[in-house]
Amino acid sequence: MFRWLPWKFFVKHAARRYGVLDPALLLARMRRFAQPSEVAEPLELLRAGIVFHARGLVNAKAIQHNLDWVWPYWVERQFNPADKSFVPRAFSFSHINLTHRNWTAVGLPGAPVYPIVDPRGLVTPLHDGWSLDFWIVTDSRRRLLPSKLDDEAVKQRLLLEPALAVTTACRIDGLRLDLATSMEIAEHGSAEVRTKIRAVSDEDGWLVVAVRPYNPEGIQFVQSIAIDSSGTAFRVNDEATVKLGEPPDSLRMAHYAEGDVYLDLPGKNGQREVRCDVGMATGAALFRVHAGIPRDLGVSVTLERDFRELPKRADT
């Protein structure tokens, strides 16, 4: 039935009504630039492009008006007029990552899931999901934020032995942060992405494990964050568990109207959960660091959502 409806007429009428180009006419004009083909534009590419720029529209709203937040590496570079990666945005239809599309997947043979690590150690455990970032904040409010560091302050390596891992070493003004991210098989047989962290500071401060509503492509919504009853794990969007290994010394959480949780650090807040209708919830677990003493921590994230969705992805 729907096949016989005059879709082209409806689309043309809607385009004329809202003063935009007729998509059917535009595609017909585009085809004239190439030799005739038996195959039109691949539907998969059109679908991917729609999703790609839909995220870009969200990025344009969320990032542009909140540049005081801590954003991923590509945003900190591409949105900075003083950086060589700067891309003017005044007439951009959408804001997408055009300059730093060089993240690394960590995985295991036989495990069809691919957590990724960006050039500054930002970990995205789930496919097209939210991320974990790691910071140092001192009592005098000096900060080591990997995404904001110059290239000279960061060294990243891909290790193949004894297991596949991405290591990221950050150094600045007496602060040092070392990260090693890999995927491992947990005791119960499922895979988890794990990050080993070592923080060293020349003064007392905090190691921060932060839940971030974005990934190297842009915004990825976080609607809820909650600490579990043991106090040693976050549950994010009710789809994955962030295991902290030990109870944090302090917790901070915020929804979009309150701004980025980063703006309130270190601070003290006993809030155990947050919900955000906008999808921009942020959370931070703080662990005390003493001057000159290395602070080690292991963080792991369960990947049950990605394993559960594998049959669905195979069908699309």
Task: State where each predicted segment sits.
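Terminal accessory carbohydrate-recognition/targeting modules of carbohydrate-active enzymes
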Residues: 1-316
